[in-house]
């Protein structure tokens, strides 16, 4: 049972005891992370695992109860996860942050940690070069929009398995007090997308210009796939279409083989462009439960 409200000194002692236990667990967690890092090195796995991070946060949100805000819980764990990536390897972020739109910096900081090395760049090309040249592990760029005259994503199309691709969508856990100039963002980096249970996949379809958007979308739908975003860029006699698909659909999925076959020679190439774990919804972030019912001397919640 909690102390009575009139016993402030005992309540503070209770909080201090909880803080000590939380701190002890953080120390223990860092010790386990060091062993995980060694295991990843032996298995030649990347320290940065965005899919795993999303699964951790979703699991905690699902089990959460009490008055502590879910959005704050997510932010705390984002800081902790960012710190543990730093414990495992070098990690830096390149951010598109033009003078007139600083909101992307806030999104990057909130997701990748306030103590993670971050560099601001005034052009999208600089961000892409920082990632492709290895000066940054991740680059944060604006969400693609339909009708762009020179979309940044067309510069990253490659068959190379090690080429940078989309790894996350920001914000994952709500915008908080981040500046609202600029819409959401996509993060690009190297690595293989991991299935998390709630995913989006991006593919780029290079085709002749005489194949219509409607035909592409009808073909996708006929295969039982759901397109959640579509943008195209035309150049000379060819077009590149960025297609976002609901769910985890790797480039080797038989349905994408059928997509290639149905479009035939009109489809020149179908390239993977990464994907991301679906961010938490506003409804999930607003979730709350009952109040505090115990402290460190009993069953602690909150």
Model-derived regions: residue spans:
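Domain-level signature for soluble enzymes in the chorismate/prephenate branch of the shikimate pathway
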Residues: 1-302
């Amino acid at each position: 049972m909690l102390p009575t409200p009139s016993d402030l000194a005992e309540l503070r002692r209770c909080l201090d005891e909880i803080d000590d236990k939380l701190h002890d667990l953080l120390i223990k967690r860092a010790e386990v992370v060091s062993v995980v890092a060694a295991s990843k090195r032996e298995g030649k796995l990347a320290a940065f695992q965005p899919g795993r991070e999303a699964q951790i946060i979703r699991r905690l949100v699902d089990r959460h109860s009490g008055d502590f805000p879910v959005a704050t819980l997510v932010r705390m764990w984002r800081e902790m996860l960012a710190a543990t990536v730093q414990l495992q390897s070098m990690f830096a972020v390149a951010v598109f942050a033009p003078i007139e739109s600083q909101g992307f910096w806030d999104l990057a900081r909130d997701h990748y940690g306030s103590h993670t090395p971050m560099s601001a760049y005034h052009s999208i090309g600089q961000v892409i070069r920082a990632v492709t040249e290895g000066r940054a592990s991740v680059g944060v760029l604006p969400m693609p929009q339909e009708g762009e005259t020179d979309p940044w994503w067309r510069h990253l199309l490659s068959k190379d398995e090690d080429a940078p691709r989309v790894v996350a969508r920001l914000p994952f856990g709500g915008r908080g007090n981040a500046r609202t100039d600029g819409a959401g963002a996509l993060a690009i980096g190297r690595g293989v997308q991991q299935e998390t249970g709630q995913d989006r996949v991006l593919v780029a379809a290079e085709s002749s210009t005489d194949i219509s958007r409607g035909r592409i979308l009808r073909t996708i739908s006929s295969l039982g796939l759901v397109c959640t975003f579509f943008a195209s860029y035309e150049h000379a006699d060819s077009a590149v279409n960025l297609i976002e698909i609901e769910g985890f659909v790797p480039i080797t999925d038989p349905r994408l083989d059928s997509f290639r076959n149905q479009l035939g020679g009109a489809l020149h190439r179908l390239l993977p462009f990464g994907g991301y774990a679906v961010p938490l919804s506003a409804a999930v972030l607003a979730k709350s439960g009952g109040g505090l019912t115990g402290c460190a001397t009993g069953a602690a919640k909150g």
